Amino acid sequence: MKDLLWKDFRENRTVLTAIGLLLLIPYGISIVIAVVDLYRGYTTSWAELLLSGSTIALFLSAGVTSFIAGNAIAGERANRSAEFAAYLPIPRQSAVTSKAIVAISSCLFILLVNFGINRLAAWVQSDRSHDVPVQDLAFFGLPAVVLMFGVAWLFSSFSRSPVIAAASGLVAFLVLIGPSTFSMSHATGRISDSWLYWYCSTSLIAGIGGFVVGVVHYLRRVEP
């Protein structure tokens, strides 16, 4: 299993590196703003800049889970390494378990690091006007992450294109969040709560269901 995990990590190394560089951009912009303000003689709270940068990075972290899941299986087919792996005595159960562990652990690491930085900056920052409540992150962010990951994983198990698989997760989120946000913004009381519960439950069911179906399809697939 250790060799499988290392193999799958190498398969996803390019994508993870690109994602890491992408998530550094908001923090880099915050540093540039701090340097410019310091040069101009302005006093800017580093916690405020870090909070802004980490909030953007946290939202980006949710989106990139779709790319990680989309590349988990389809990426191996795209570079033809799946054909080589098919001739090795590797049980498909072990192969899909390794891919799932690498993909899920990568997503959790990215999300937890940015979430931790965001909460640290919010704790230091005295002005909470720009703070994103934890309950909002839980009710909107967690179902979105599960939805995008599960749908992208499902398409990755069928597709040879990691781009198409990754895009499917983002499209699923946009299709679901559009009507949900519109309905919740024009509803009040119990109706608004009903739409929120519908969004959460639908996202979780679709995401978990997509992941399970993707695993089953991979196990039953004859081709690599």
Over which residues does each language-model region extend?
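Short helix-to-coil transition segments within interhelical loops
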Residues: 86-92
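Central hydrophobic cores of alpha-helical transmembrane segments
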Residues: 21-24, 153, 163-176
